[in-house]
């Protein structure tokens, strides 16, 4: 089970809800993923405009936990305002803190992320910050009291997969809160690898919404996350430079 604060989830796959070809495909992909946590950008939702289309209306919200995010924020103050807007609209008090420091790479601003996380913790939010794979920054966020750490595998939407597995493994090793690999996942292989490293979960969006068949890809990601987790728990064999026969020498037939 994935445990975030006082909540437990059977699925370790968190799914983003942006950029799907249609509401219908989005709904089918969400269902196929069997994800229980759905994230979305508050700024791109028509929360207070009932006349405008809203993907939340297409879903059975009793089945999902909503994870609003502060995408579009460039300062801690902006992120806090967006989080409060989400809470005021009756959405979940969990918030994914996302403060972008570079428009080209979409990498997070470490200083503003720390500031926003600290303020939102003081306001009583369940805080899940999107961060880089900086090991020290991850530790500082945990020391603040965040409820999960969400290091990026690579830049948002890049599909490059896990660029720095060593740093991710360091973050996972030191963390006492869930580590959810977020951003840059491009294929089921990437999702499985993140879980094999020991991550507690994977959050992805573009890998599914941008696939030729988002519904099938959502299903593939579900199985990849499950396989990676099982592989991690089972324990892989150590790598060696030379081959080792799988058949024992003892009792070998002499011909």
UniProtKB/Swiss-Prot annotation:
The keyword Transferase applies. GO terms for molecular function: thiazole synthase activity. It catalyses: [ThiS sulfur-carrier protein]-C-terminal-Gly-aminoethanethioate + 2-iminoacetate + 1-deoxy-D-xylulose 5-phosphate = [ThiS sulfur-carrier protein]-C-terminal Gly-Gly + 2-[(2R,5Z)-2-carboxy-4-methylthiazol-5(2H)-ylidene]ethyl phosphate + 2 H2O + H(+). InterPro entries: Aldolase_TIM, Thiazole_synthase_ThiG, ThiG. The active site is at 96 (schiff-base intermediate with dxp). Pathway: Cofactor biosynthesis; thiamine diphosphate biosynthesis. Keywords: Cytoplasm, Schiff base, Thiamine biosynthesis, Transferase. Its EC number is 2.8.1.10. It is an enzyme of class 2 (transferase). GO terms for biological process: thiamine diphosphate biosynthetic process. HAMAP family: ThiG. Catalyzes the rearrangement of 1-deoxy-D-xylulose 5-phosphate (DXP) to produce the thiazole phosphate moiety of thiamine. Sulfur is provided by the thiocarboxylate moiety of the carrier protein ThiS. In vitro, sulfur can be provided by H(2)S. Homotetramer. Forms heterodimers with either ThiH or ThiS. This is Thiazole synthase. It comes from Bacillus licheniformis (strain ATCC 14580 / DSM 13 / JCM 2505 / CCUG 7422 / NBRC 12200 / NCIMB 9375 / NCTC 10341 / NRRL NRS-1264 / Gibson 46). The gene is thiG.
